[in-house]
Every structure is written in C-alpha cells, then in structure tokens.
Amino acid sequence: MNSYIEKVPGVSSAESSAYTGFLYFEEVGKMEVTKILNEYYGSYDEDNRLRSRHGSVEFLTTMRYVEKYLMPGMRVLEVGAATGRYSHTLARQGYMVDAVELVQHNIDIFNANTLAEENVRIYQGNAKNLHMLTDNTYDITLLLGPMYHLFTETEQKQALAEAIRVTKKNGVIFAAYCGNEATMVQYCFGRGMIKEQHYRDLIDPVTFKASSDPAELFELYRKEDIDTLMTDFSVTRLHYVGTDMATNYMRQTIDEMDADLFDLYLQYHFAICERSDLVGASHHILDIFRKD
C-alpha cells in the first residue's frame, strides 16, 4: 500500500501527478526497486509538482524550516535530490551543496538545470550506502525522498544512519515521510477502494495501518513508526512538521486562490503545521532533528 502520486485519467499531468493515493503495480511483480523507481520517475515531473501552487506549500514549508538553521558558509547535503529543486535553490543562495540521487533520469534533469555559478555536485548513489561521502562533513542534511521507498526497518535505519554519519555534530537532519492517514482518507474511503479485497489485504483491520512492498512504490508511516526508528540514534528532535497539512485535500481550491487569499492560507498553514493533533493527517511529514 502506498501514498502514490497517481496518474488519474481525465485530469492534467500536473494535477494527476499530485494526487496521493495508492496504486498497485501489478504488472511489475517482483521487479527490483531500482528498476521500479527508474520507470516511475522517468515519466513523473517532480519539479513541476513542487512549482504548482498546491505543491509549493510543501516546498515553502520545508524551506522555511531549513532556513531557520542555515548560516553563511554552511555545507548542505541532499540525499534523494530528484531533479534538484532544493539543491539548486540552496546553491543559488550561495551554499556549497552536494547531492545524491539514485535515478539517472533525475540526474540528467538536475545537471541540465545547474547554473554555472552554482557550487553544487551530484553523485549517483543509494541512501543506504553513502560510501562516497566522509563522516561529519555537512551542517545540514536533507533526506527528503528516500524514506518513501524503503520497506524494511533495516533499510530505513540504514538510510537514517548514513544521513547522521555524514552530518557534523550539532548539524541538523531533515527526514521526510509519507503519512498513512491521508491515503486512507483520500483513496481508500474517498474513492471506495477499501471495499476491494486486494486493498483490504494490505490494511490492518483493527488499526487501519497500510503495509507496502517495493511493487507498491511508497511506504506509509505513522508517528509511532518514526519514533521507533529513531530510538537507536543519538539525536534530539527539533520539529515534527506536516509540510502540506490540508493542502492536498483541497488542491483545486488552493490552485484557484488569488494571491492575497493564498498568502493568508500560507499564514494559517504555518500556524498549524506543528500541531500534534493535526500533523498525522498530512500527506507529507518532516522530522527535523539535531545530531548530538
């Protein structure tokens, strides 16, 4: 079961790619994760999703928190950089940025979008093994995509451990997750898919926690899952944030707002995005912690 950005028939590519639901890749069977990700991201426009008005809420929220901890001269790492929306933004602000990305299609776009004045490098690699990077190097580490696509606790902890390893003591790590409840509400109940036995088999009948495997592409989390992952690490949580909160439940409304109303909506969003009674309903969640 996944929080999959599904291509929905009858709507534009930008609109459909921002729909969060679960789409089971029955045709891929047991294909390896790398091949699945290459096929998905080879036809998916992540950069334009973040540039759409509704997608910009997630981007602006993430950047708002990153900028709380940025200082001149800091080194930044983005693991799972995709096409470089965050890396390029930070490099153009004058920061030295290294990026790691698994999918070649994304790397090609990343390189095509790199300006001559950017101090940025990109490596092809896996979040679970950042062997090309040395310990205690970065002031800020962004892990904004890999946790979506890791399906075992061992793999998830490997990615977190690597991000922490390469971050300096007292550096700040930003780890993003897909939330369980948004998919349950919008897809399972909103589209009635929970009535289908295939999906019922993927959902705990008591807790309504969805399960995933690589063929389903996205892993879904609740806060208790994230808390369990973090127990082995010497870190201090700084913020636990819903980066889009209500936004993806009302994408069309957001996209049709005039500038003044959208600005007011952002003020509201920023006011509630750390509320512990609401964050669990967000499609995307950001765990921000300091390396002790």
Residue ranges and their predicted role:
Residues H131-T141:
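A short acidic, Gly/Pro-enriched loop at the edge of an enzyme's catalytic core
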Residues V28-P72, R85, T89, I173-L202:
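Conserved class I S-adenosyl-L-methionine
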Residues L217-S234, Y240:
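Short alpha-helix
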Residues K157-K169:
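A short glycine-rich, Lys/Arg-flanked "PGG" loop and its adjoining helix->strand segment in the class I
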Residues R85-N129:
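Class I SAM-dependent methyltransferase SAM/SAH-binding core
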Residues H239-D292:
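A C-terminal cap/extension of S-adenosyl-L-methionine-dependent methyltransferases
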Residues I140-T154:
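A short SAM/SAH-binding and catalytic strip from SAM-dependent methyltransferases
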